[in-house]
């Protein structure tokens, strides 16, 4: 996890892939592509750079190579010429097989000494080898000796000496038949050039080595592969990743030719990691497919080789934000593990796999399983003192615990990570600072402001020498948030100013918007009205920047104040300064951000024709956010502009897909015209930690905002109590007083006078409720007003997850009332609805007919799709819920998860999910939000879902009346209201009639 610090999983898992392979099948794998330089092979003698740099370019340096390498002024006399001829004759006579073998033995002895760490004795042996080879005029031996001596000086960082040695080696080997030796010499020269900061000539030498190997059609492809791997490693070491790619590819090709499938898989897995590091995520996935192809065709150990291949694939999928597919890939991997000889699977392999799978599970919200896998990995890393991975994994577990509100456990894990950092060498400063920031964020949220301040001050101290304005700005901003909460306004403002100064240097909008929100709050507290308005206007400008968007990772908490709460302060500040329209748009942007992040986290699927664009655009956005951590935002301005141009084009051609990738700008005029066209009143809520904003938009073009003095946690508690009470009292004859009290309290809180004055006077005009967080799980129809009546008795209601749902709604798809019902159960429900509306209007799918493809075909042209399956949505990931539908796999049928529906085409006016139920612990309302938006993307205009499972008799009766009303020409909102009124007249108990929630425009 070392390539990209803010995407630790995506980077390190590729490295772990190579390590995993080495530990499973016994190849000489390494922890990173660079570690090959330390491998114990003959090639390890070629670890340096060189080329054709002039003496002026590299400077002069006295060289002492022994008596056999003296630079002398040539003697032009005839006696000298005759003497040379005579010596040549003598040397030719001395060059025998025995003398050549002696030269080679000296080289082998030198290599053994060098690999054993005895470098000086090795150098002496190579010098002796060179002298003997020169005596017998054995140029190949001379060249090999010089190459190895060049390696010695490269390792000693004496690059000028290494350069001259490498150049002489190439001159000696230029006309040699030993082309492999010449290729190695060129690599040695390339290493020297790299050391002299001459990468252009270094790459030329590596290219020349590659050409030699390709033209010579080496009889030893394994040796050629090793040379190519070394070339690739050098390119990585000296930051030439694009050049490294082709050398890795050549190395893998040679290893395949040599039937070394394990090495071929390892090299291509390493290449996957490099491509991920470079941000070429799609190319990484394509390369991972090649890894799997090699693994499957391996004549032996195929299953074992598929483990790193699957891991490489999961890495690429994770990098592409395709978290659901990454999860499925890991599921395949762990299903395959038992088929491998367990003796081949070391504890380190298990730790690597647990670590990778844990990060994927955390990304999709399966926190319990994620903690199990990460804890297993952490325990191993800690035992073997793999301190970096131990610290990073402990930090990730701490973030998981914090996300679940387990602050005590979270702080304990962060403290362990901090303690481990004390013994990490070299120091991982950024990871340490991130952990301290995470610790401070949790302490802030648990009320330990003093401890949070101390940990942030430690983070500021350890990063003081780093030339990283973004990091400094982030720490100053975090410290300001803690100081503000501690009422230390003076120091809070001082740190805000520091944060602004540092962030402005690198145009870091993600910090600037937060800093100006805080600055405005301080100024408003001092009654500096004009300055406060100026600051909040600046904050809004930065907030709208795509670079400031939220892109959370599984190992960071961001800031002490969550993005949701800081955005609430932004909206509240705008509204209090008379900028209500801008406040409403800021609230919309925040909600769209939250939806996009939750969609990606849960693994929402898209239509096949949209998948490539979706993955490319979303991964490009993720890559830009990741790159900001490695560089600075100002260096990525052109890339962001390019991304925005593509996003605008996509928004114009495929708006529904664009909304799954990033928030789209919305204008107030669009909002007003849509509300007026629908003759509706929109009531939108934005929940903060301490208070809530209620916006109203009516058909007369009026926009208002009202501050409600209750925050998110209060509503979460009330809704949870309500849902628990409803489920607990199932079967009772009357609603409990507790339920009525909660419903009446919620009405008075959510509909204060400032909101009620804009509500319609008659039920002929629609109210569109746009909730936030826990309010998604609230049955608004059942709220009890000051007269003791349910809200639905006086108003026509629908719910939308966002104003954009209204903006994007299309006209009715089909005026002809017809229903497709799909279920293997619920016969009574299907029969009663069919009898009520007429069997000729109902198509019932059962058994094998409920395949997804057939369902999609049968639903085409129908006005409604009815799904009576009982589905209880889990707390963290509703899309993992299993449905009664199937898809064909390998000639058989397999049940599918809820997310697969979104990739289909369901062009229906209405989809009814009649027996769903939400989890009372789902405090964000994600189940209804994600399911309704996903089905809307698939083509549905309205979605009717149930918050809890009503008693069957009352539920079916309400559904029958709903469809009768729909058949009579009413729209979905009118149909549901009339059915609920009929149910209330029979039994006013909330649990028996208020479970259904309509999401969509309502018409």
What spans do the regions from the language model cover?
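Eukaryotic all-alpha helical interaction scaffolds
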Residues: 114, 126, 133, 153, ...
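Amphipathic alpha-helical protein-protein interaction segments
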Residues: 65-73, 85, 513, 529-788, ...
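A domain-level signal for caspase-like cysteine endopeptidase catalytic cores
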Residues: 414, 773-776, 806-873
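Catalytic cores of nucleophile-dependent amide-cleaving enzymes
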Residues: 799-809, 864-961
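Conserved alpha-helical positions within TPR/SEL1-like repeat arrays
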Residues: 104-115, 141-155, 181-195, 222-237, ...
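Caspase-like cysteine protease fold
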Residues: 551, 880, 887-906, 952-1003
């Amino acid at each position: 996890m070392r390539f990209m610090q803010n995407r630790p999983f995506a980077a390190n898992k590729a490295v772990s892939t190579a390590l995993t392979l080495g530990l499973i099948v016994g190849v000489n794998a390494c922890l990173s592509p660079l570690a090959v330089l330390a491998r114990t092979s003959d090639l390890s003698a070629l670890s340096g750079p060189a080329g054709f740099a002039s003496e002026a370019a590299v400077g002069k340096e006295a060289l002492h190579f022994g008596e056999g390498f003296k630079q002398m002024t040539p003697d032009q006399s005839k006696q000298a010429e005759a003497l040379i001829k005579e010596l040549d004759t003598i040397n030719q006579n001395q060059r025998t097989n025995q003398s050549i073998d002696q030269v080679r033995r000296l080289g082998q002895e030198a290599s053994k000494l060098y690999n054993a760490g005895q470098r000086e004795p090795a150098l002496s042996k190579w010098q002796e080898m060179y002298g003997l080879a020169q005596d017998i005029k054995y140029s190949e031996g001379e060249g090999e000796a010089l190459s190895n001596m060049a390696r010695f000086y490269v390792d000693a960082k004496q690059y000028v000496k290494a350069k001259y040695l490498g150049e002489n080696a190439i001159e000696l080997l230029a006309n040699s038949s030993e082309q492999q030796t010449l290729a190695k010499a060129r690599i040695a020269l390339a290493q020297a050039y790299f050391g002299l900061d001459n990468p252009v000539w270094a790459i030329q030498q590596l290219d020349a080595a590659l050409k030699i190997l390709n033209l010579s059609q080496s009889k030893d492809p394994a040796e050629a592969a090793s040379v190519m791997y070394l070339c690739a490693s050098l390119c990585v070491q000296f930051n030439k990743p694009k050049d490294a790619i082709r050398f890795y590819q050549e190395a893998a090709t040679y290893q395949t030719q040599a039937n070394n499938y394990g090495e071929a898989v390892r090299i291509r897995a390493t290449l996957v990691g490099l491509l991920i590091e470079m941000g070429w995520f799609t190319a990484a996935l394509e390369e991972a497919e090649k890894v799997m192809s090699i693994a499957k065709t391996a004549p032996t150990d195929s299953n074992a080789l598929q483990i790193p291949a699957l891991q490489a694939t999961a890495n690429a999928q994770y990098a592409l934000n395709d978290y659901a597919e990454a999860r499925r890939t890991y599921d395949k991997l762990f299903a395959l593990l038992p088929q491998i000889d367990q003796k081949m699977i070391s504890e380190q392999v298990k730790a690597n796999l647990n670590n990778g799978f844990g990060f994927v599970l955390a990304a999709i919200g399966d926190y319990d399983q994620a903690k199990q896998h990460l804890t297993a990995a952490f325990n191993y890393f800690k035992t073997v003192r793999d301190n970096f991975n131990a610290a990073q994994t402990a930090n990730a577990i701490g973030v998981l615990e914090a996300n679940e509100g387990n602050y005590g456990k979270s702080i304990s894990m962060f403290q362990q990570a901090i303690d481990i950092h004390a013994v990490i060498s070299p120091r991982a400063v950024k990871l340490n600072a991130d952990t301290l920031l995470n610790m401070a964020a949790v302490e802030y949220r648990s009320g330990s402001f003093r401890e949070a301040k101390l940990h942030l001050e430690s983070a500021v101290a350890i990063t003081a020498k780093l030339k990283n304005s973004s990091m400094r700005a982030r720490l100053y901003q975090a410290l300001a948030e803690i100081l503000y909460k501690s009422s230390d306004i003076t120091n809070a403002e001082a740190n805000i100013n520091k944060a602004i100064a540092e962030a402005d240097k690198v145009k870091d909008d993600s910090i600037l918007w937060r800093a100006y929100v805080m600055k405005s709050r301080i100024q408003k507290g001092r009654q500096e009205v004009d300055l406060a308005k100026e600051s909040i206007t600046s904050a809004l400008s930065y907030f709208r920047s795509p670079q400031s968007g939220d892109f959370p990772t599984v190992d960071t908490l961001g800031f002490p104040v969550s993005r949701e709460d800081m955005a609430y302060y932004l909206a509240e500040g705008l509204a209090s300064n008379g900028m209500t329209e801008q406040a409403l748009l800021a609230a919309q942007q925040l909600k769209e951000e939250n939806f996009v992040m939750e969609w990606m986290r849960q693994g929402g699927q898209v239509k096949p024709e949209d998948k490539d664009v979706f993955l490319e655009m979303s991964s490009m956005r993720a890559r830009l956010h990741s790159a900001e951590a490695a560089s600075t935002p100002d260096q990525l301005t052109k890339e962001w502009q390019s991304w925005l141009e593509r996003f605008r084009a996509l928004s114009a051609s495929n708006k529904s897909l664009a909304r799954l990738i990033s928030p789209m700008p919305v204008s107030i005029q669009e909002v007003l015209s849509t509300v007026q066209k629908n003759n509706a009143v929109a009531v939108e809520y934005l929940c903060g930690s301490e208070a809530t904003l209620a916006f109203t938009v009516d058909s007369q073009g009026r926009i208002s905002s009202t501050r409600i003095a209750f925050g998110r946690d209060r509503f979460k508690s009330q809704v949870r109590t309500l849902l628990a009470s409803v489920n607990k009292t199932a079967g009772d004859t009357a609603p409990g007083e507790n339920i009525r009290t909660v419903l009446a309290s919620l009405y008075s809180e959510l509909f204060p006078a400032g909101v009620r004055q804009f509500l319609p006077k008659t039920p002929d005009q629609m109210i569109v409720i746009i909730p936030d967080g826990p309010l998604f799980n609230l049955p608004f129809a059942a709220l009890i007003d000051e007269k003791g009546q349910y809200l639905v008795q006086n108003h026509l209601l629908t719910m939308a997850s966002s104003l954009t749902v209204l903006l994007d709604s299309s006209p009715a798809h089909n005026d002809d009332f017809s229903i497709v019902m799909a279920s293997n159960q619920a016969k009574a429900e299907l029969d009663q609805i069919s009898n009520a509306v007429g069997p000729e209007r109902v198509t019932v799918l059962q058994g094998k007919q409920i395949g997804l493809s057939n369902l999609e075909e049968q639903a085409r042209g129908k006005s409604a799709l009815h799904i009576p399956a009982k589905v209880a949505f889990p707390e963290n990931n509703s899309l993992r819920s299993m449905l009664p539908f199937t898809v064909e796999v390998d000639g058989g049928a397999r049940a599918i998860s809820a997310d697969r529906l979104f990739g289909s085409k369901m062009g229906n006016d209405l989809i009814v999910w009649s027996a769903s139920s939400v989890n009372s612990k789902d405090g964000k309302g994600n189940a209804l939000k994600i399911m309704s938006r996903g089905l809307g993307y698939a083509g549905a205009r309205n979605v009717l879902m149930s918050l809890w499972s009503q008693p069957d008799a009352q539920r079916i009766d309400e559904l029958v009346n709903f469809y009768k009303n729909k058949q009579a020409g009413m729209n979905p909102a009118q149909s549901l209201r009339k059915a609920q009124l009929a149910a209330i007249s029979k039994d006013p108990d909330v649990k028996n009639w208020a479970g259904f929630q309509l999401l969509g425009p309502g018409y």
